[in-house]
Amino acid sequence: GVEAVSDRIVDFAKNLADGDMSKFEKLKGAIEKGFGMARKSLGGKLPDISQATYAATMKKLDAWKNGTGAKTGTEKTE
């Protein structure tokens, strides 16, 4: 569902960043671009579930950036 997919997207971004928050904007931009490409290929509008996934992903990315995000469901803990 929406939560699982958005968790995976954010976890992927976190793993790519490897703790380097200077990569945040580039990663967020790449995610936005990916959703934009999907939107374009679908005639300019994403299905409702994809719109919800985009919104959840952006919210989780912002929480990560601001240090206010809880761990995602798939995030590794040490």
Stretches found by the model and what they are:
Residues 1-78:
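Type III/flagellar secretion export determinants
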